Amino acid sequence: GNGKIIQELEGIFRGAGWNVIKVIWGSYWDQLLAKDKTGLLIKRMGEAVDGEYQAFKAKGGKYVRDNFFGKYPELLDLVSQMTDKDIWKLNRGGHDPHKVYAAYYSAMQNKGTPTVILAKTIKGYGMGKSGESINTTHQQKKLGEEDLLYYRDRFDVPLTNKQVSNIEYYKPSENSPEIKYLKECRIKLGGNLPERSSFAKVIKTPAIDIFDKMKESTGDKEMSTTMILVRMLTNLLRDKNVAPRLVPIIPDEARTFGMEGFFQKIGIYAHEGQKYEPVDSEQLSSYREDIKGQVLEEGITEAGAMSSWIAAGTSYSNHDISMIPIYLFYSMFGFQRTGDFAWAAGDNQTRGFLIGATAGRTTLAGEGLQHADGHSHIMSSVIPNCKSYDPTFGYELATIFRDGLYRMYEKQENIFYYITTMNENYPHPAMPKDKSVEDGILKGMYLYKEFNNYKKTKIQLLGSGTILREMLKAAEILQNEYKIDSSVWSVTSFSELRKEAIEVERYNL
C-alpha cells in the first residue's frame, strides 16, 4: 500500500530493455487533464500511493473529492462543477476499452523489443459494495441478488430480473458480432476444444547391447555411478532413434559431472550460435555453442533448468514429438529447491529423467552440508507418478535407465524417473545371472549376498546407494568378529517398496 507498483515494474522492465506502456487513467479523466493548467492534477496523481487509490474506489465520490482533490484548493475548484457521482465515474485505464485497445495497438507497432502493458485496475471490479476495492474480495464466494442486479445494471447485461434471480447466463445470439468474432478466433486456434494428446510417435527402446558394458565388472577400476551414467548417455548417442531426442540439461556443473565430452559431440544450444573463440579452444572438449546444439546449459538457475525439463518432457503432448530430457544436478539442489516444479511435472504428466548426481553423504564433505544429501528421496516419494531409485552398482543403473526408456517412450506411460547417482568411486561387480535380479532391481529390492557360515542367528541388512557397501562391510564384521550370519539386500528404491506396500494394504482393506 505504501508504494506504487506500476512505477516499480516500469523501472524493472525498462532496465531490462523492454518497451513499457502504462494504461493508468480512463477516458473520463481526459477533460480534467486538459483543463488543468497548473500541473497540480498530475502532481497529485503522482503523490497518492496504491493504498490510497484502493480507498478512493472503496469509499465513494465524496471521499475522493475530500481526500484526493481536497489536498489542493485549486483541484477542488477544478471539480467544483462535478457531482459526487461524476467524480465516482472517473475511471481507471485498465477498465477503459478505448485506452486498453490504444495500448494494444501501440504495442503491436513496436519493433525490436518486447512490450509490457501495465494497466491500473480495481480489485473486485463490478462487485459493488460486496467486494469492489475492499480486502474481503478474496473471501467472497458468491453474490446476493441485490449485488447481481447491481452488476447487471452497471454493465448493461440484457437479462430480466427473473433471469438474474435464477442466476442464468447471458449468451449473445449466434448472429451477434461477439459470437461471430469468438468463433473466428477459435477457428484460428485450431478448433473449439483444446486437445491433449497422450501419445506421440513411439521411440523404440535401444538394443540391450548398448547397456551391456555397464553390466560388466569394472575389475579393480574404481568408478562412480555418475561417471557410469555419463558413459551410458555417450553410448545412447550412437543410437540413431534415440540420439536426436536426447536433451541433456545442466544447471551449472557440466565438468563436475564429466560431461564436457558432450560439448563437441552434440554442442550446447545457443539461438545465436557462437560469436567468440572459447578460452579452452585448444582442448579436445572445448566449449562449443551451436544453433543446432542439444545440451541446455542453463547457468546457475535450477528453476530455469527445471522449466526446460518440463517443456521438453511434455513435448510429446504439446507438439507430438517425444523428447528425452535428462536433467543432471547436485541432488541437494533438486527437490529441496524446486519441489513445486517437480509436483507440477507430475500434474503435467511430464516424461523424462531427473538425475540427482553426486548424491549421498560419504563424499563432498569438504564443501559442507550443502552437498550432503541423504533425504531427497523422501521428498520425491510424495509425487505419485515419480519413480525414485537409488542404485549402488552400474548394472542396477543400466537396468533402471533402460526400463525408464521402455516405459516412458515405448509404452508411453505418464511417469518420470528420479535417479540418484554417486560421487564416490569404487569397483562395480558384474550383474548376477539370476533372472530374478532384474525384477528385484525394478521392484525396489533384491537379495545381493548371503553369509551362511554359522547357521544360527541371521540378521537382515538393507542398504541403498553408497550405504549398501557399508552394509557389506558390516556383514563381514558380524561374520568374522561375532560369528553372526546375515543377508545383505540391495534396496534400489525404498519409494517403490512403500508404494507396493500401500497398494497391498489398500487391496486387503
Model-derived segments and their meaning:
Residues 1-7, 11-12, 21, 255-256, ...:
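Conserved thiamine diphosphate
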Residues 2-302, 307-311, 455-467, 473, ...:
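Conserved acidic/glycine
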